[in-house]
Amino acid sequence: MNGLGMQKFEHPLNERTRIYLRIESLLRKLGHSADLTQPYEYQVFFSSLFHMLDILEQVQVKADLGKDLEKLRLQYRAWMNIEGVDQSALLSVLEQISQVHQNLMQTTRPGHSLKEDRFLSALKQRFFIPGGDCCFDLPALHHWLHLPLDVRCRNTHNWMSQLLSLSDALSLWLRLTRETARYTPQIARNGFMQSEMENSNLLRLEIPIDQGVYPMISGHKSRFALRFMSFETNKNCEKDIEFTLAVC
């Protein structure tokens, strides 16, 4: 490995996985900013929370994720009593899937209680106005920011807890999906590669940073193409690029 290390990219091969990755990114930002240890972390927290609520309003994430978890459960059940398969580990995974699926299905629509929160609703209406978090635009926010830190942190963690069943279910589905494939060495001749596969959800790439390139990817569940671009010129890279790829 080179001194600069590797850069990792993921690309969804269907719309559901695209939404799941966006939600995962927002959940990660919420988790990193919820303790409000830095002066402007509240901006990261609220912008991530409101983007999350917009996604949950537009997409039936609970129903889609429930179906995908059930599909995973059937796939794993097919391995039961197969010689050479660690049955203890398999049963553990099946129990995890059943538990997060049950918790997800028993909750109301994710984000519904947050949408009904009067403080959050008033804040969301004006939060994305450029520079709109001034005290004259959002006096309620200005008041909230002057509350004791422990009070504000209780608020942020309580709001996050409303998304816990979604977070647990999504994290498990993405983890198991990522674990379906190992990275294998690849070479993109003249910076280009295309391939076919069967019913895949996700591409994962590791690229040496000192190659000075980033990938532009298009694809769906049965075919993909990627073109490496030069970061310096923002044009097609014409050299061979070595990288590793996992098709999940």
UniProtKB/Swiss-Prot annotation:
Keywords: Cell cycle, Cell division, Cytoplasm, Septation. It holds the Pfam family ZapD. It is found in: Cytoplasm. GO terms for biological process: division septum assembly; FtsZ-dependent cytokinesis. Interacts with FtsZ. Belongs to the ZapD family. This is Cell division protein ZapD.
